[in-house]
């Protein structure tokens, strides 16, 4: 499954179908990866279903937007590499899921089936098999001559994972079939759901607590995780159950039943557990009655479900109806609304995530909902809190969304605590809410750094990335990475121990560590984890690992400036942007003082990125952390004078256009430069000097200049502009052969590594990009080039092999023919 990056701004609007479809694909693929591969879904099923249906409708309306990686062509998630792959003889297709669970939804499905079968009002009702939609992990069990020979997960619907050894530990699943009428099929694939009963889940968590181990979140994820344990002994410790509900490949079954219901009866006779909560019903009204009956008893069931499934009962009619795309026409799943309950908000706090995201959280009077006791519920972000107007003291509806993530759905306003307005009529007092609306804190509750929220983003973030303890582990992991400071040997386990055992409070502390610190840390970590290394048992202390680690830390003290900037973890600053900063501004001293308008003058730096960089360096705690690194001996290499090409970007007209003055376009900025030829003159410009500008632009500019902060920003920009002009050489350096060109690398080159090729291209002035577009000048393709090569050919982008790239690099500047 492809990995996608989180969008830098909100989703594209629906009036931009191509961009909207691309965004939907990226979101759905990310959610599917979390759900099927990581077993850590971040959104409820209802959100995935909503986005999926939107993409499906969009691709129906615009067939040209469907791409090979579209989730509408898939059934589930990717196969984990630890298990052998199993190709399903008959694909394990998913059933269409409807969120319209009213009577109209069931009737609409019945009407669709009748229409497909060509039935009219005079024909009898269609018979359906109605059953439960279990909340577990789908499994295919293969029996040959009556014996279990293989068990596989759904995987992506075509290829699953071989989990036979783990499935054999589930006592409900027969290892051999019981003959029916003295017969078992030659080949029988039975499909069903592995799940965990609620009481078994509670007992398992009780055992975990007794052992002092981490408890599990919910039965579904616990069951899925158990099936995918590499050690079958660990899987055997989890109390798993199974229900059969369908068939895969079948061969040599004498007297195979003619209906789905009778097929389940025979599976039960073969020895498979089949849920008793099922029925054969007539027509849409029968489906509605079944749906309502199960809804009424849902909470009393011994296991979790998230809906019901309707299937045309006749197997012959199923074959006649067939499939549409990835789903059968003869079946549909109807979900129930997520379970909800009323409770009271005791307080609203904010949590700081490992990447600095600030999330409001409602602390609740404990309430039992969705099978668990909920004490906290996410409020998502500042906009959501304001939209719902959630306040302390409110009675709220809490939903265990997707049966996983508790959230506040809405406020019961008529129960909001009120106070009398002071001084109002004694006999007819006016009232006002007792508690004020929620306000996001201006500073991080963990470290005190400023909280910033980028324009167009819903999430606010702590700006103290180098300082904030909530972000400390993530900041160090990034800082030490191979493409950043490349600290050899400093892996995740050591970072966790250094932070958790209080050896490292800031990144600079890495460079103060001693051999004794590492050895003591290892000893304390082993004691905490109950581990006794063999060397300790033998009366020895291993030191080589610590010596190597210290050498790796010391060796990282002189990184190239661009890599050092990348290592700081500035939001939106990747390798390419870090290189741009280093190449154009030349020194850390210049970069850490550059305001957003100056940064906007650099190539490929947009408003969002410029603001993120400026915000990072504007945070005093980040500056302190940076100074601490320099004092610890870190010395970025390759600093130089500012790039002379920046001179034209520093013209007043160019800078005026980057100030962010409303209505001051690039054209108006040039007019303004005539009236105010220098930044100092702009700071004190008089209205009569702006007669050449439209009245609305003049008014907007004067309002902007009335701000003390804006005038201070202008003075800072003017001073730094003067320093840059004084420091830069009189003429630009000689251009490289690929100066200003965009190149994409794809596939495996015969002699050069990807990093080596990238370095050579960048040395020649090229920008190395990760994706092919109309702006790409060259694609350098090696073996197994894949989709990027296909995209280049589609866009008529020139394609080079390694030899062609090397030949191009030898040409004189300006000659790329």
UniProtKB/Swiss-Prot annotation:
<dbReference type="Pfam" id="PF03119">
    <property type="entry name" value="DNA_ligase_ZBD"/>
</dbReference>
<dbReference type="InterPro" id="IPR012340">
    <property type="entry name" value="NA-bd_OB-fold"/>
</dbReference>
<protein>
    <recommendedName>
        <fullName>DNA ligase</fullName>
        <ecNumber>6.5.1.2</ecNumber>
    </recommendedName>
</protein>
<comment type="function">
    <text>DNA ligase that catalyzes the formation of phosphodiester linkages between 5'-phosphoryl and 3'-hydroxyl groups in double-stranded DNA using NAD as a coenzyme and as the energy source for the reaction. It is essential for DNA replication and repair of damaged DNA.</text>
</comment>
<feature type="binding site">
    <location>
        <position position="447"/>
    </location>
    <ligand>
        <name>Zn(2+)</name>
    </ligand>
</feature>
<dbReference type="GO" id="GO:0006281">
    <property type="term" value="P:DNA repair"/>
</dbReference>
<keyword id="KW-0460">Magnesium</keyword>
<keyword id="KW-0520">NAD</keyword>
<feature type="binding site">
    <location>
        <begin position="94"/>
        <end position="95"/>
    </location>
    <ligand>
        <name>NAD(+)</name>
    </ligand>
</feature>
<dbReference type="InterPro" id="IPR013840">
    <property type="entry name" value="DNAligase_N"/>
</dbReference>
<dbReference type="GO" id="GO:0006260">
    <property type="term" value="P:DNA replication"/>
</dbReference>
<feature type="binding site">
    <location>
        <position position="311"/>
    </location>
    <ligand>
        <name>NAD(+)</name>
    </ligand>
</feature>
<feature type="active site" description="N6-AMP-lysine intermediate">
    <location>
        <position position="133"/>
    </location>
</feature>
<dbReference type="GO" id="GO:0046872">
    <property type="term" value="F:metal ion binding"/>
</dbReference>
<keyword id="KW-0862">Zinc</keyword>
<dbReference type="InterPro" id="IPR003583">
    <property type="entry name" value="Hlx-hairpin-Hlx_DNA-bd_motif"/>
</dbReference>
<feature type="binding site">
    <location>
        <position position="468"/>
    </location>
    <ligand>
        <name>Zn(2+)</name>
    </ligand>
</feature>
<feature type="binding site">
    <location>
        <position position="131"/>
    </location>
    <ligand>
        <name>NAD(+)</name>
    </ligand>
</feature>
<keyword id="KW-0436">Ligase</keyword>
<feature type="binding site">
    <location>
        <begin position="45"/>
        <end position="49"/>
    </location>
    <ligand>
        <name>NAD(+)</name>
    </ligand>
</feature>
<dbReference type="GO" id="GO:0005829">
    <property type="term" value="C:cytosol"/>
</dbReference>
<comment type="similarity">
    <text>Belongs to the NAD-dependent DNA ligase family. LigA subfamily.</text>
</comment>
<feature type="domain" description="BRCT">
    <location>
        <begin position="733"/>
        <end position="817"/>
    </location>
</feature>
<dbReference type="InterPro" id="IPR010994">
    <property type="entry name" value="RuvA_2-like"/>
</dbReference>
<dbReference type="GO" id="GO:0003911">
    <property type="term" value="F:DNA ligase (NAD+) activity"/>
</dbReference>
<dbReference type="Pfam" id="PF01653">
    <property type="entry name" value="DNA_ligase_aden"/>
</dbReference>
<keyword id="KW-0235">DNA replication</keyword>
<feature type="binding site">
    <location>
        <position position="193"/>
    </location>
    <ligand>
        <name>NAD(+)</name>
    </ligand>
</feature>
<feature type="binding site">
    <location>
        <position position="335"/>
    </location>
    <ligand>
        <name>NAD(+)</name>
    </ligand>
</feature>
<dbReference type="InterPro" id="IPR001357">
    <property type="entry name" value="BRCT_dom"/>
</dbReference>
<keyword id="KW-0234">DNA repair</keyword>
<dbReference type="InterPro" id="IPR013839">
    <property type="entry name" value="DNAligase_adenylation"/>
</dbReference>
<dbReference type="InterPro" id="IPR041663">
    <property type="entry name" value="DisA/LigA_HHH"/>
</dbReference>
<dbReference type="Pfam" id="PF12826">
    <property type="entry name" value="HHH_2"/>
</dbReference>
<dbReference type="InterPro" id="IPR036420">
    <property type="entry name" value="BRCT_dom_sf"/>
</dbReference>
<dbReference type="InterPro" id="IPR004150">
    <property type="entry name" value="NAD_DNA_ligase_OB"/>
</dbReference>
<feature type="binding site">
    <location>
        <position position="154"/>
    </location>
    <ligand>
        <name>NAD(+)</name>
    </ligand>
</feature>
<dbReference type="InterPro" id="IPR018239">
    <property type="entry name" value="DNA_ligase_AS"/>
</dbReference>
<feature type="binding site">
    <location>
        <position position="462"/>
    </location>
    <ligand>
        <name>Zn(2+)</name>
    </ligand>
</feature>
<dbReference type="Pfam" id="PF03120">
    <property type="entry name" value="DNA_ligase_OB"/>
</dbReference>
<dbReference type="InterPro" id="IPR033136">
    <property type="entry name" value="DNA_ligase_CS"/>
</dbReference>
<dbReference type="InterPro" id="IPR004149">
    <property type="entry name" value="Znf_DNAligase_C4"/>
</dbReference>
């Amino acid at each position: 499954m492809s990995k996608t990056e989180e969008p830098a701004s909100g989703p594209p609007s629906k009036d931009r179908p191509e961009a909207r479809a691309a965004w939907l694909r990226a979101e759905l693929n990310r959610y599917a990866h979390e759900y099927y591969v990581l077993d850590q879904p971040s959104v409820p099923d209802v959100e995935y279903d909503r986005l999926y249906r939107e993409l499906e409708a969009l691709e129906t309306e615009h067939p040209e937007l469907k791409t090979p990686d579209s989730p509408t062509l898939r059934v589930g998630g990717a196969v984990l590499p630890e298990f052998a792959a199993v190709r399903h003889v008959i694909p394990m297709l998913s059933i269409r899921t409807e969120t319209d669970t009213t009577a109209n939804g069931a009737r609409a499905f019945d009407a669709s089936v009748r229409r497909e079968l060509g039935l009219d009002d005079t024909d009898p009702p269609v018979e359906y098999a109605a059953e439960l939609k279990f909340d577990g992990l789908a499994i295919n069990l293969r029996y040959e001559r009556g014996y279990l020979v293989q068990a596989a997960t759904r995987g992506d619907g075509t290829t699953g994972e071989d989990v036979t050894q783990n499935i054999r530990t589930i006592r409900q699943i027969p290892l051999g079939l019981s003959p029916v009428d003295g017969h078992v099929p030659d080949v029988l694939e039975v499909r069903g759901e592995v799940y965990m009963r609620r009481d078994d889940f509670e007992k398992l968590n009780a055992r975990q607590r007794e052992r002092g181990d981490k408890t599990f979140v919910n039965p579904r994820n616990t069951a899925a995780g158990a099936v995918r344990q590499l050690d079958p002994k660990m899987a055997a410790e989890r109390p798993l159950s199974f229900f059969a509900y369908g068939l895969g490949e079948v061969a040599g079954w004498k007297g195979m039943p003619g209906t789905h219901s009778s097929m389940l009866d025979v599976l039960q006779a073969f020895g498979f557990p089949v849920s008793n909560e099922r029925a054969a019903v007539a027509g849409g009204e029968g489906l509605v009655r079944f749906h309502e009956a199960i809804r009424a008893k849902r909470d009393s069931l011994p296991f979790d479900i998230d809906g019901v499934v309707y299937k045309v009962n006749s197997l012959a009619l199923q074959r006649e109806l067939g499939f549409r795309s990835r789903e059968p026409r003869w079946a549909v799943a109807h979900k129930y609304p997520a379970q909800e309950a009323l409770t009271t908000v005791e307080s609203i706090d904010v949590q700081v995530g490992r990447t600095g995201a600030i999330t409001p959280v409602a602390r609740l009077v404990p309430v039992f909902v969705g099978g668990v006791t909920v004490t906290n519920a996410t409020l998502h972000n500042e906009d959501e809190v304001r939209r719902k107007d959630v306040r302390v003291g409110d009675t709220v509806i809490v939903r265990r969304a997707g049966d996983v993530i508790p959230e506040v759905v809405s406020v019961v306003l008529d129960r909001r605590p009120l106070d009398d307005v002071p001084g109002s009529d004694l006999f007819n007092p006016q009232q006002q809410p007792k508690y004020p609306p929620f306000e996001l804190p201006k500073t991080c509750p963990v470290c005190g750094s400023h909280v910033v929220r980028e324009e167009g983003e819903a999430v606010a973030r702590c700006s103290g990335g180098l300082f904030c303890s909530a972000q400390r582990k993530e900041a160090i992991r990034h800082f030490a990475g191979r493409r950043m400071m490349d600290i050899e040997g400093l892996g995740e386990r050591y970072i966790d121990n250094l932070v958790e055992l209080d050896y490292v409070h800031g990144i600079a502390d890495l460079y103060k560590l001693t051999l004794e610190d590492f050895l003591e840390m290892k000893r304390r970590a082993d004691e905490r984890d109950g581990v006794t290394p063999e060397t300790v048992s033998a009366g020895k202390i291993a030191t080589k690992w610590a010596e190597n680690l210290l050498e790796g830390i010391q060796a990282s003290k002189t990184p190239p400036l661009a890599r050092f900037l990348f290592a700081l973890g500035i939001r939106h600053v990747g390798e390419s942007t870090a290189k741009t900063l280093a190449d154009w501004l030349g020194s850390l001293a210049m970069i850490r003082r550059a305001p957003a308008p100056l940064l906007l003058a650099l190539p490929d730096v947009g408003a969002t990125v410029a603001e993120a960089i400026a915000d990072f360096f504007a945070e005093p705690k980040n500056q302190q952390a940076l100074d601490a690194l320099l004092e610890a001996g870190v010395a970025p290499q390759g600093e130089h004078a500012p790039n002379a090409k920046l001179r034209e970007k520093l013209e007043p007209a160019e800078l005026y256009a980057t100030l962010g003055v409303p209505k001051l376009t690039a054209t108006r900025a040039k007019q303004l430069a005539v009236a105010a030829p220098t930044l100092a003159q702009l700071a004190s410009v008089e209205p009569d000097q702006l007669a050449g500008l439209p009245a609305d632009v003049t008014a907007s500019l004067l309002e902007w200049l009335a701000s003390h902060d804006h005038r201070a920003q202008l003075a800072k920009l003017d001073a730094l502009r003067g320093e840059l002009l004084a420091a830069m050489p009189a003429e630009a350096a000689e251009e490289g052969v690929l100066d200003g060109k965009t190149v994409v690398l794809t596939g495996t080159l015969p002699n050069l590594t990807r990093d080596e090729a990238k370095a050579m291209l960048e040395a020649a002035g090229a920008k190395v990009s990760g994706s092919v577009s109309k702006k790409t000048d060259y694609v350098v393709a090696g073996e197994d080039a894949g989709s990027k090569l296909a995209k280049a050919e589609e866009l008529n982008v020139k394609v080079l092999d390694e030899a062609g790239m090397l030949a191009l690099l030898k040409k004189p500047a300006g000659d790329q023919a």
